[in-house]
Design a protein with these regions (language model features):
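Residue-level recognition of well-ordered beta-strand positions that form the cores
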Residues: 2-4, 19-21, 94-96
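Short, well-structured beta-strand segments enriched in hydrophobic/aromatic residues
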Residues: 86-97
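Short coil-to-beta strand junction motifs in C2/discoidin
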Residues: 10-22
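Intrinsically disordered, low-complexity acidic/polar segments
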Residues: 8-10, 29, 102-104
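Proprotein-processing/basic-patch segments
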Residues: 98-134
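Extended, solvent-exposed segments with strong compositional bias
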Residues: 34-87, 103
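A short beta-strand element within beta-rich, extracytoplasmic domains
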Residues: 2-12
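Surface-exposed loop/edge segments in extracytoplasmic proteins
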Residues: 24-30
Length: 134
């Protein structure tokens, strides 16, 4: 997913603590460095106002048996098994900026035809069946 902060106008130096929640459980936080408007986003439409944010940073969030990671760096000890999911479980994913964060710089989520990556949020869920007793 492509993310950035949300400043009045744009400001490349506008940090924001973006929290990731799974089923309303905080799984980690990443600090976006800014709200980028210095150059036009590769896929941002020409009709988009030039003084609005143009692009973000592509981030990969992984939750597995070892913890929660963003771009390969561990951001929390929350593990997938902490959720006790089964085949009937609903999964709700949320991004937010808390009012009590150190950096309350808002959040911009880019999708197809905006920013520098022509994609929506991509989600991959993989699982392993538990061993069977024979």
């Amino acid at each position: 997913m492509e993310l950035s902060s949300e400043a009045p106008g744009t400001n490349n130096d506008w940090p924001s603590d973006i929290a990731f929640l799974l089923n309303d459980t905080p799984i980690g936080t990443w600090t976006s460095p800014g709200d980028f408007g210095d150059i036009h986003g590769l896929f941002t439409p020409s009709w988009w106002f030039p003084y609005w944010n143009q692009y973000g940073l592509l981030k990969t969030l992984i939750l597995n048996k070892n913890g929660t990671f963003i771009d390969g760096l561990k951001i929390s000890d929350i593990r997938i098994q902490d959720f006790h999911f089964d085949y009937k479980s609903s999964i709700h994913f949320k991004l937010s900026v808390s009012e009590d964060s150190s950096n309350i710089g808002g959040l911009t989520l880019f999708g197809s035809n905006f920013g520098n990556y022509n994609q929506d949020i991509k989600v991959l869920v993989s699982y392993q069946l538990p061993p069977q007793d024979n």
